[in-house]
Design a protein with these regions (language model features):
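Membrane-interfacial amphipathic/re-entrant helices at transmembrane-helix boundaries
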Residues: 1-28
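Membrane-interface helix termini and inter-helical loops of multi-pass transporters
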Residues: 2-12, 122-136, 245-248
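Loop-to-helix entry region at the N-terminal start of transmembrane alpha-helices
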Residues: 18-21, 125-152
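Hydrophobic alpha-helical transmembrane segments
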Residues: 20-25, 72-77, 102-103, 141-146, ...
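Short loop segments and helix-boundary regions at transmembrane helix junctions
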Residues: 35-50, 54-122, 218-230, 247-250, ...
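Membrane-helix/interface signature in polytopic inner-membrane proteins
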Residues: 153-187
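Transmembrane alpha-helical segments in multi-pass inner-membrane proteins
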Residues: 201, 205-256
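Cytosolic-side transmembrane-helix boundaries in multi-pass membrane proteins
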Residues: 252-287
Length: 287
């Protein structure tokens, strides 16, 4: 039973192997970005940007159909533009950056759905919103793997700066005047790039789930930042494997099955995590 559910599909079927490789690559890169979003108290920014890329993806779709290059380029440009404009608005107005993102992403989501509806069918819209992980081809797998490798390399090279900017940006601003802006720009670019890569697999609505939920779950267990990063990546990879296996075994949509698996791990961590222990606190309160 265990062999047939969790191992045999990936040995026998090439599309399952490609889906697993892509999910593992995304788990390594997006979860680490999710941890840094958590440290910055900007957890909803990932959700906002995942919606913000939809108009660019839709424009690429209108111009070139289901072209990987066109939709990727359009989504990346749209995400960067929204991030820059939201940052500019937050500096020029009393609004904070997360509030600016909230305003822009709602309009972006509506615009993207409208653009796709001009040409596509409901099937095309569902593909863009929820992805089609089992239909990932070789080019998409290479693209996602390349994005994950680039992200891990950038995090390794800029780790100290990213940590300093997340915990004490004022100190970094005093000692290195231009560095915080450069690090923030790099972080946003990596965030948008990973969301665009995730859209190829899980769609714009589901991609952020793989980014944020393992990060939050890991925070309930680990005490140190390296521990949170490693645990989040491991949780993301484990849930990707379990989600794909369960989707195969009981005929569930693969993308939602993965996100549901991560959600289940999040709730377990919330109640039983050594840093959370919500259940123990609830029993103490009731007792």
């Amino acid at each position: 039973m265990i062999w047939h559910t969790f191992f045999q599909p990936f040995i026998e079927f090439g599309f399952m192997r490609r889906a697993l490789v892509v999910c593992l690559a995304l788990s390594l890169s997006t979860t680490m970005l999710g941890v840094f979003l958590l440290l910055r108290r900007m957890s909803l920014m990932g959700d906002a940007l995942s919606h913000a890329i939809l108009p660019g993806v839709a424009v690429g779709y209108l111009l070139s159909g289901m072209s990987l290059l066109a939709m990727t380029l359009g989504g990346f440009i749209a995400g960067i533009v929204v991030a820059l404009v939201a940052g500019w608005v937050s500096r020029r107005t009393p609004l904070k950056e997360d509030a600016s993102f909230a305003g822009f992403y709602l309009g972006s989501l509506a615009l993207g759905v409208t653009l796709v509806s001009l040409r596509g069918s409901s099937v095309d819209l569902l593909h863009l919103l929820f992805g089609s992980i089992l239909a990932v081809d070789r080019d998409a797998a290479l693209f996602v793997s390349g994005v994950a490798s680039l992200t891990l390399l950038c995090i390794a090279l800029c780790y100290r700066g990213l940590v300093s900017e997340a915990f004490d940006s004022a100190w970094l601003q005093v000692n290195h005047r231009r560095l915080p802006a450069l690090l923030h720009g790099l972080f946003l670019a990596l965030l948008v790039l990973n969301l665009v890569a995730g859209f190829q697999v899980l769609g714009t609505l589901m991609a952020v789930g793989v980014m944020m939920l393992p990060a939050v779950a890991a925070r309930c267990w680990a005490r140190t930042l390296p521990g949170i990063l490693l645990l989040a990546a491991g949780m993301g990879a484990l849930c990707a494997w379990l989600g794909l296996s369960l989707s195969w075994a009981i005929s569930l949509p693969a993308g939602p099955a993965i996100v549901l698996t991560v959600s289940a791990l999040f709730f377990v961590s919330l109640f039983f995590g050594t840093r959370s222990r919500l259940l123990v606190g609830w029993r103490t309160l009731m007792g």
